[in-house]
From Swiss-Prot:
Residues 463-478 have a biased composition (Acidic residues). Residues 450-462, 505-515, 557-571 have a biased composition (Basic and acidic residues). This is Nucleolar protein 58. Residues 285-410 form the Nop domain. GO terms for biological process: box C/D sno(s)RNA 3'-end processing; endonucleolytic cleavage in 5'-ETS of tricistronic rRNA transcript (SSU-rRNA, 5.8S rRNA, LSU-rRNA); endonucleolytic cleavage in ITS1 to separate SSU-rRNA from 5.8S rRNA and LSU-rRNA from tricistronic rRNA transcript (SSU-rRNA, 5.8S rRNA, LSU-rRNA); endonucleolytic cleavage to generate mature 5'-end of SSU-rRNA from (SSU-rRNA, 5.8S rRNA, LSU-rRNA); protein localization to nucleolus; snoRNA guided rRNA 2'-O-methylation. It comes from Aspergillus clavatus (strain ATCC 1007 / CBS 513.65 / DSM 816 / NCTC 3887 / NRRL 1 / QM 1276 / 107). InterPro entries: Nop56/Nop58, NOP58/56_N, Nop_C, Nop_dom, Nop_dom_sf, NOSIC. Keywords: Nucleus, Ribonucleoprotein, Ribosome biogenesis, rRNA processing. Residues 582-592 have a biased composition (Basic residues). Residues 443-592 are annotated as: Disordered. The gene is nop58. SMART domains: NOSIC. Gene3D superfamilies: 1.10.287.4070, Nop domain.
Length: 592
């Protein structure tokens, strides 16, 4: 079988013919092809098609990189159509598959590792195989073609178009962190001079602008704060500046604080500009995705996937949990429930849903978003297509999802075209307002002197005295619960005095018994409760230790066990006697 070798160069296509049909199976191929003479003895030039210009060379090589067969290459391969039993060696397997699909070309393609040695030798000694090709010209053409190819990839790569979105959303997140850090530093720094301002003014940007406008708090009389603050806050700020308890600072300190405040204001203005730029880029590149989930969530999805093309290749289930990979793998490892949503959770449609409907909306929204992303990434729009036409799929899908969500939540359906806020209400533009910070409510303070006397004198822990149980023979009856009249108050006082006297008498008896036992009253009571006090025939108490009690319990257990064993032995002896009697009776019957 005749072997042909296809070689792509910066100058053109070369088709080489092997002199040995079993060239690729030789063991000494690497040593034979080490020199130019050895390569010339192994292969010879069959045909060579030169590129007409640098632009043509760029077009041909760009097609080869994508695995496409160009008309120029197809015409070169037509020269070996008529030959029988032909094999063709190709360096790129992707290109080999494309050549194999050409109609009317019955050849055996070889695109594996066996061709590596011969291709290495051909590239090293290419000028000796192609007549009229100088090594200097070859290197110049290779360098120019590589530069053109790199420029072409950077300019026309579809993955590079959305790089602006990836970088913009990353910068937006960084700006938010830096802006928050700088604003907190301004508040802490200027708070030494004017601490009351932070309690009145919540907005960080307005705070920084006020620092730049007023400077020292003593300038409150001459400062016009109407451009920064509304009327309801301007008065409290000036009043607080008049009676502020802050420390004095030097002019040098104020200049440094104002320099930092300028950075805060500058960052805030640039962040607003960057957010507008990101919205415009998202509407231009991914209009359907933006219509469904918003510009910020859509940009984060694209940044997480790497590019719009990579995101379009993902199924709806992947888009739904994109950004929650750590929770997903932890759930799979511990065999728990997997997360229902990732970055898509921050979309307004999911924010409007409540309870179990959040998971349902996340699933449906991810399915619609996957369709919209594929349209954004792969659709070829005409030049006269409007933005409404490009975003028609996303707009229609969002309208249907809003109606579905309203049906799930049991809410009235909104008219078409009405924007819906995350809380489910119709979104309307609001006037910018600066809310006053919450102040400390001094009226809610309560002093100990303000409390009623009964509450003040009341103890935290009340000791309830033990009441003596009345004897069954006694004629006294317990007092009934409920309201008492004035006439019964005297009787209750008498009863209390009687109980107090009886308690004193009982304590006196216990003291006498404790003295006989040689113990204190508290210890005697404790031992009496535990059962460690025994009385003899005369009624004299004696204290028993815990060890003696344990020994007595053990001896009682042993005695009970011994009785059980004796019973078992006696039962066993009776059974043996009965068995012997039965055997004797059987013997007598046998003798008879």
């Amino acid at each position: 079988m005749t072997l042909f070798i296809l070689t792509e160069t910066s100058a053109g296509y070369a088709l080489l013919k092997a002199k040995d049909k079993k060239l690729l199976k030789r063991d000494d191929l690497a040593t034979e092809a080490a020199t130019a003479e050895g390569v010339s003895n192994l292969v010879k030039l069959k045909s060579f098609q030169k590129f007409d210009s640098a632009a043509a060379a760029l077009e041909e090589v760009a097609s080869l990189v994508e695995g496409k067969v160009t008309p120029r290459l197809a015409s070169l391969l037509d020269e070996i159509k008529d030959e029988k039993k032909v094999s063709l060696a190709v360096a790129d397997p992707k290109l080999g598959n494309a050549i194999g699909k050409l109609p009317g070309l019955d050849i055996q393609l070889i695109a594996d590792s066996t061709t590596a040695d011969i291709y290495r030798a051909i590239r090293e000694h290419l000028p000796t195989l192609i007549p009229g090709l100088l090594p200097q010209d070859m290197s110049t053409m290779s360098l120019g073609l590589s530069h053109s190819l790199a420029r072409h990839k950077l300019k026309f790569s579809p993955d590079k178009i959305d790089t602006m979105i990836v970088q913009a959303i990353g910068l937006l997140d960084d700006l938010d962190k830096e802006l928050n850090t700088y604003a907190m530093r301004v508040k802490e720094w200027y708070g030494w001079h004017f601490p009351e301002l932070a309690k009145i003014l919540n907005d960080n940007i307005a705070y920084a602008r006020l620092v730049l406008k007023m400077g020292m708090r003593s300038n409150w009389e001459t400062s016009d704060l109407a451009e920064i603050l509304p009327e309801e806050l301007e008065g409290p700020v000036k009043a607080a500046a008049d009676r502020s308890m802050g420390t004095e600072i030097s002019q040098d300190d104020l200049e440094n604080i104002q320099a930092l405040a300028e950075q805060v204001v500058g960052f805030a203005e640039y962040r607003q500009q960057l957010a507008g730029y990101l919205t415009a880029r998202m509407n231009a590149i991914a209009p359907n995705l933006t219509a469904l989930v918003g510009d910020l969530v859509g940009a984060r999805l694209i940044a997480h996937a790497g590019s719009l093309t990579n995101l379009s290749k993902s199924p709806a289930s992947t888009i739904q949990i994109l950004g929650a990979e750590k929770a997903l793998f932890r759930a799979l490892k511990t065999k728990h429930d997997t997360p229902k949503y990732g970055l898509i959770y921050h979309a307004s449609l999911i924010g409007q849903a409540t309870g179990k409907n959040k998971g349902k909306m996340a699933r449906v929204l991810a399915a619609k978003a996957s369709l919209g992303i594929r349209v954004d990434a792969l659709a070829d729009w005409e030049d006269d297509a409007t933005e409404e036409d490009k975003a028609a799929l996303g707009t229609e899908a969002r309208y249907n999802l809003e109606r579905k969500l309203a049906a799930m939540e049991g809410k009235p359906l909104k008219p078409r075209g009405v924007a819906i806020a995350p809380n489910g209400a119709s979104a309307q533009p609001k006037k910018f307002e600066l809310n006053e910070a919450r102040k400390y409510n001094a009226d809610a303070d309560a002093l100990s002197s303000d409390e009623p006397k009964s509450k003040k004198d009341k103890k935290l822990i009340e000791e309830v005295s033990d009441e003596e149980m009345a004897d069954a023979d006694s004629d006294e009856e317990p007092a009934a619960n409920g309201t008492k009249d004035d006439d019964s108050s005297d009787d209750s006082e008498e009863e209390k005095s009687k109980k107090h006297k009886s308690k004193k008498g009982k304590d006196a008896e216990l003291e006498k018994l404790a003295e006989r036992a040689g113990l204190s009253l508290k210890r005697y009571k404790r031992k009496l409760e535990r059962g460690e006090i025994t009385f003899d025939a005369d009624g004299n108490p004696t204290a028993v230790s815990k060890k003696d009690l344990k020994k007595a319990k053990k001896e009682a257990k042993k005695a009970s066990k011994g009785d059980e064993k004796k019973r078992k032995r006696s039962d066993d002896g009776e059974e043996v006697d009965n068995a012997e009697k039965k055997q004797k009776k059987k013997k007598k019957k046998g003798e008879e």
